């Protein structure tokens, strides 16, 4: 099989590494890279709350949240979702030279578990 790559109009690859279609197919259903850890700090949660105007107490009030059902403040689901570019650009498969990246869309996104302030996440 031939090699496949995504190129811009000028012929420059949009992604840093080329994978043959055979190698890419072999990775279906398997882990294709692990990102660097990302610290989910209260400061980051507060900044996200300010930008999005979502200042629910479960996100921004550590004292009240400590008494609540989750035992402390938790990150917004959309804060975690917004880290997808970070995860992509810091793993061994997608890291490298990108000319640009564009979000195409999402399907069936769910937030099954809360992420407490002070946690670390990665893909």
Stretches found by the model and what they are:
Residues 69-72, 82-123:
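Hydrophobic beta-strand-centered segment that forms part of the acyl-chain substrate-binding groove
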Residues 4-75, 89:
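Catalytic strand-loop segment that frames the active site of acyl-thioester-processing enzymes
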């Amino acid at each position: 099989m031939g090699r496949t790559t995504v190129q811009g109009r000028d012929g420059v690859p949009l992604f840093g590494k080329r994978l043959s279609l055979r190698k890419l197919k072999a990775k279906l259903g398997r882990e294709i890279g692990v990102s660097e850890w990302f610290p989910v700090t209260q400061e980051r949660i507060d900044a996200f709350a300010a930008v999005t105007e979502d200042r629910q107490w479960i996100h921004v009030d550590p004292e009240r949240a400590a008494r609540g059902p989750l035992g402390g403040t938790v990150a917004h689901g959309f804060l975690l979702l917004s880290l997808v570019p970070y995860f992509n650009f810091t793993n061994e498969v997608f890291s490298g030279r990108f000319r640009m990246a564009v979000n195409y869309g999402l399907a069936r996104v769910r937030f099954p578990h809360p992420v407490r302030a002070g946690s670390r996440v990665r893909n």
